[in-house]
Amino acid sequence: MAHYRNDYKKNDEVEFVRTGYGKDMIKVLHIQRDGKYHSIKEVATSVQLTLSSKKDYLHGDNSDVIPTDTIKNTVNVLAKFKGIKSIETFAVTICEHFLSSFKHVIRAQVYVEEVPWKRFEKNGVKHVHAFIYTPTGTHFCEVEQIRNGPPVIHSGIKDLKVLKTTQSGFEGFIKDQFTTLPEVKDRCFATQVYCKWRYHQGRDVDFEATWDTVRSIVLQKFAGPYDKGEYSPSVQKTLYDIQVLTLGQVPEIEDMEISLPNIHYLNIDMSKMGLINKEEVLLPLDNPYGRITGTVKRKLTSRL
């Protein structure tokens, strides 16, 4: 029978690995009005702070704790006075505020996710104040800064759903007694892209333009030329091609992580009804699904 001790009020046998607290999902819509022309940024922000002391954990002493409600209010006020030019600059502003305002804050971490609003446009004319929700990839960022250190900035894309109906296959894989999957030269390829990249600390970055560039590269390597496509022998190859092209075209990026679920569409068997279904009617299969991941970084020699 296990025996449990009750004398952990002051214990020398355990130590903290990491601590933090904060406020998640602080939602803000910021409107910038330039006459009748309006611009918007809707974001959800999460903030985590690490303090120099642990007395709130050890003794229930809250004298160093910045209330999470104060953190929420601070984010709202910073949005008002600083605006949201990009979610990355907004996240850096939040980190710098808490580190400069409170000497006992030793680390600030901020996650910001942008709601994908797009301005109405018709025949090349942009509407002055109307927007449409366009879920074709969500822009997010993660910024971490420790006291006396530079901010480490990651940007990313998630929830970018793409599908092509041909120019994909999967052959030459290992087959054992449990393998039932047939080789296929032509199949549907569908995925929901998640990718995240880290910026070089010593470079000025146009975050909005860089995000647009990376998204365009992802779509380009997935789809290929518009008139004929591009063959993908595996999800892994497509993933790697995206990374190589991105680091080749965007010098501001140091490393890149991508996760691609392989979302299956299965041919529906209609033989019992006397019909031959030639990959015309498919069953979308939510799960289970394969998931392929990879992270690449620049070699040291490529930075010189």
Curated annotation (Swiss-Prot):
The modification Phosphoserine is found at S39, S63, S232. Its EC number is 1.7.3.3. The modification N-acetylalanine is found at A2. Keywords: Acetylation, Oxidoreductase, Peroxisome, Phosphoprotein, Purine metabolism. The active site is at K23, T68, H264. Pathway: Purine metabolism; urate degradation; (S)-allantoin from urate: step 1/3. The modification Phosphotyrosine is found at Y289. It is found in: Peroxisome. The modification N6-acetyllysine is found at K10, K23, K27, K36, K118, K122, K164, K175, K185, K221, K228, K278. It is an enzyme of class 1 (oxidoreductase). It holds the Pfam family Uricase. GO terms for molecular function: urate oxidase activity. A motif (Microbody targeting signal) lies at residues 302-304. The keyword Chloroplast does not apply. It comes from the Eukaryota. InterPro entries: Uricase (IPR002042), Uricase_CS (IPR019842). GO terms for biological process: purine nucleobase catabolic process; urate catabolic process. Urate binds at T68, D69, F170, R187, V235, Q236, N262. The modification N6-succinyllysine is found at K10, K23, K221, K228. It catalyses: urate + O2 + H2O = 5-hydroxyisourate + H2O2. Homotetramer. Belongs to the uricase family. Catalyzes the oxidation of uric acid to 5-hydroxyisourate, which is further processed to form (S)-allantoin. This is Uricase. It comes from Sus scrofa (Pig). The lineage of its organism: Eukaryota, Metazoa, Chordata, Craniata, Vertebrata.
